[in-house]
Amino acid sequence: MPITQYKAAAVTSEPCWFDLEAGVQKTISFINEAGQAGSKLIAFPEVWIPGYPYWMWKVTYQQSLPLLKSYRENSLPVDSEEMRRIRRAARDNHIYVSMGFSEIDHATLYLSQVLISPTGDVLNHRRKIKPTHVEKLVYGDGDGDTFLSVVDTDLGRLGQLNCWENMNPFLKSLNIAMGEQIHIAAWPVYPGKETLKYPDPATNVAEPASDIVTPAYALETATWTLAPFQRLSVEGLKKNTPAGMEPETDPSTYNGHARIYRPDGSLVVKPDKDFDGLLYVDIDLNESHLTKALGDFASGHYMRPDLIRLLVDTRRKELVTEADPDGGVATYSTRERLGLNRPLDPPKDERHGIVGVAGQKSAEQRKAGDL
């Protein structure tokens, strides 16, 4: 049975723009802070490391290239020592960590999320299935084995989605069908509605994302919904402006948009415009009972699977495949290829690929204090 009552935290802060190492250090600092406050879960925004490339919405492709190069150089491989440091921080603080980051794998960037357990294991590694609009100039698509969201934990069934994925009715239905109880609606950095100059979809500014999309997700799914958001400063505006262009001067429109909602869609907490830090909430999973009693969609008593069904394909689609010795096709999962099934800190012999009796004996001797 999961723990039904616990504290959780959502990050509303400015990323360390174009600086992988500083971003890792700030991430670990927040994990330490949340752990010391007694939180069992901390949620970071979309592409928290190295920040959301919001400049791509404001400049031409040619103007963006120097920023794009620096952004790629500071993106985070999921199988890197930097990620292992973040995983160790989760383990040291006995806390679940939901973190969005720009993942670089081979030569492609992905809008990725990980869910790290209190033992430092990566329980889920997912990639946004379809980058939004101009994001396609920076990121690639997720695959069949990297898009599932909901994981069974001792805090309940916890799910994560990135930005406009939280509006996707198919992903929402899938999460409901998987029994999601706690949801991380990870958002990037958004301008306020006062910045609009032309007729534009309402969801292209922060207020609807914070005050319409996110509570609608909470209500429709009956989940505790944490919506971490990035922030911007005057210095951040300068860093995100190509050379030769005048940066914006007022960052306030980008700030104050993080939210936490109850399973009935009611607001728990939102920050002031100048707040930078952690928003806390005391979660009680039993609060979802009445919302679920009225509307258990997708997999429960308020749906008709004999009439409406969702087809899901979680297979990885390979560009290159190899024939196996039995005449079939050899395949592998993204998790396996990136080493996410291996222990965080395996014994030295295992890290060098040596597995056998000698290695087992050495481990036993180390445990006994002989080495």
Swiss-Prot record:
Residues 339-353 have a biased composition (Basic and acidic residues). The active site is at 46 (proton acceptor), 128, 163 (nucleophile). One of its GO terms (biological process) is cyanide catabolic process. Induction: By cyanide. GO terms for molecular function: cyanide hydratase activity; nitrilase activity. Pfam families: CN_hydrolase. It is an enzyme of class 4 (lyase). Residues 339-371 are annotated as: Disordered. It catalyses: formamide = hydrogen cyanide + H2O. Its EC number is 4.2.1.66. The keyword NADP does not apply. It comes from the Eukaryota. InterPro entries: C-N_Hydrolase (IPR003010), C-N_Hydrolase_sf (IPR036526), CN_hydrolase (IPR037544), Nitrilase/CN_hydratase_CS (IPR000132), Nitrilases_CHs (IPR044149). Residues 6-285 form the CN hydrolase domain. Keywords: Hydrolase, Lyase. Oligomer of dimers, forming left-handed helical fibers. Catalyzes the hydration of cyanide to formamide. Degradation of cyanide may be important for plant pathogenic fungi in infection of cyanogenic plants. Also acts on 2-cyanopyridine, fumaronitrile and benzonitrile, albeit at a lower rate. Belongs to the carbon-nitrogen hydrolase superfamily. Nitrilase family. This is Cyanide hydratase. It comes from Stereum hirsutum (strain FP-91666) (White-rot fungus). The lineage of its organism: Eukaryota, Fungi, Dikarya, Basidiomycota, Agaricomycotina.
